């Protein structure tokens, strides 16, 4: 049997510090919000267990950390720094950083080590917040459950859309944490599924159980389906224009209409991508080119940034469009032409609502 000094993380750790922070966290939540927590009795008093929840804001990890009666070791984003004071606070509390979009065996070994010490692991199977309610479950939760033979406790978080901004504005939002009954640990049955497919089936079950604990009204806040399109025109100084086709414009439109991805680049990574935000203002060729180059610089360091968030095909198409558009911008600058991008987004909601957004990027030489 392994002893604690054989693991990279000795569980439990930072016990006194975390107890104090948890007390402070609960007090702040009562002051700044209206937390409603139910079902904590479903969390086993001992043994390895995985807490798995949905994720739409920066607040869910706080509730997952401070309310269970056992110390929770959280898995979090290691590919992006957190914003402002949150980055320092999270580092002080401690978590297991995972490089999303790339195979991070080291993080998974650390997480498995926590479970092998009969610990509690907190995880978000969707892996991010950029498309809540429509994202595919990542198989990491199934792999960890299988290897450690740990049950999974589904947790539904409700009322968290724009929750952090509401807290900062002292609006005291109602934040619900609903803990469900345990899902037995994953076991590989002798059926026709491959191991990969079996893991995905289990991860999908976990996410389904999580979503069943979320207030239905929350799903009305995000589109059930959306599509994107983009047209590109070159306009000469005399006013004549011509349509130009490049690969990946639809994927590029999806990227530009996803604020979470742009915010990650601008706020977390401090990249100069503000010219890419959908506004009606005219941009200068140099500014827009620098913004696109900043995206490529991130992809050089983290190749999975787009593919993890958009899917492999869409991510590669968006990257291709960025590279081709950058070349076209150089040509347009040298020939004194204006580039016009007409981007559209259509969204359909579960309650029958339809939304259309149109943004034009006018990029002058």
Spans of features found by a protein language model:
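A transmembrane-helix-recognition feature enriched in membrane-embedded lipid enzymes
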Residues: 2-38, 70, 84-93
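Short, basic, glycine/proline-bearing loop/turn elements
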Residues: 24-26, 92-98, 124-129
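Glycine-rich helix-loop-beta junction characteristic of Rossmann-like nucleotide cofactor-binding loops
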Residues: 40-44
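Active-site phosphate/pyrophosphate- and oxyanion-stabilizing loops and adjacent acidic/basic residues
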Residues: 26, 62, 142
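A conditional alpha-helix N-cap/helix-loop micro-motif detector
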Residues: 33, 101-105, 134
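Non-catalytic C-terminal accessory region of glycerolipid acyltransferases
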Residues: 2-17, 106-365
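Conserved beta-strand scaffold positions in the cores of enzyme catalytic domains, especially
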Residues: 37, 74, 95-97, 152-154, ...
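Catalytic core of membrane glycerolipid acyltransferases/transacylases, capturing the structured
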Residues: 21, 45-102
């Amino acid at each position: 049997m392994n002893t604690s000094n054989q693991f990279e993380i000795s569980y439990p750790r930072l016990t006194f510090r975390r107890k104090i922070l948890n007390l402070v966290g609960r007090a702040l939540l009562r002051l700044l919000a209206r937390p409603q927590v139910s079902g904590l009795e479903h969390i086993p008093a001992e043994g390895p267990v995985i807490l798995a929840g949905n994720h739409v804001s920066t607040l869910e990890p706080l509730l997952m950390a401070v309310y269970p009666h056992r110390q929770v070791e959280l898995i979090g984003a290691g590919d992006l720094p957190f914003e402002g004071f949150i980055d320092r606070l999270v580092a002080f509390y401690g978590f297991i950083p995972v490089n999303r979009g790339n195979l991070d065996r080291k993080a998974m070994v650390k997480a498995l080590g926590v479970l092998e010490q009969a610990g509690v692991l907190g995880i978000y199977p969707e892996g991010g917040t950029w498309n809540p309610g429509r994202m595919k479950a990542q198989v990491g939760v199934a792999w960890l459950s299988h290897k450690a033979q740990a049950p999974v406790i589904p947790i539904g978080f409700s009322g968290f859309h724009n929750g952090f901004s509401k807290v900062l504005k002292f609006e005291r939002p109602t934040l619900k944490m609903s803990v469900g009954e345990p899902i037995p640990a994953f076991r590989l049955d002798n059926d026709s599924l491959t191991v990969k497919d079996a893991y995905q089936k289990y991860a999908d079950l976990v996410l389904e159980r999580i979503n069943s604990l979320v207030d239905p009204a929350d799903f009305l806040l995000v589109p059930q389906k959306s599509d994107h399109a983009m047209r590109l025109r070159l306009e000469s100084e005399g006013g004549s224009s011509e349509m130009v086709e490049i690969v990946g414009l639809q994927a590029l439109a999806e990227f530009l209409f996803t604020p979470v991805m742009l915010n990650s680049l601008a706020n977390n990574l401090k990249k100069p991508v503000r010219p890419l935000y959908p506004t009606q203002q005219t941009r200068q060729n140099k500014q827009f080119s620098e913004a696109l180059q900043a995206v490529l610089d991130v992809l050089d360091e983290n190749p999975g940034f787009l593919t993890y968030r958009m899917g492999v095909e869409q991510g590669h198409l968006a990257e291709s469009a960025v590279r081709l558009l950058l070349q076209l911008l150089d040509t347009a600058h040298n020939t004194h032409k204006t580039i016009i991008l007409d981007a559209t987004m259509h969204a359909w909601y579960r309650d029958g609502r339809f939304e259309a957004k149109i943004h034009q990027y006018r990029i002058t030489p």
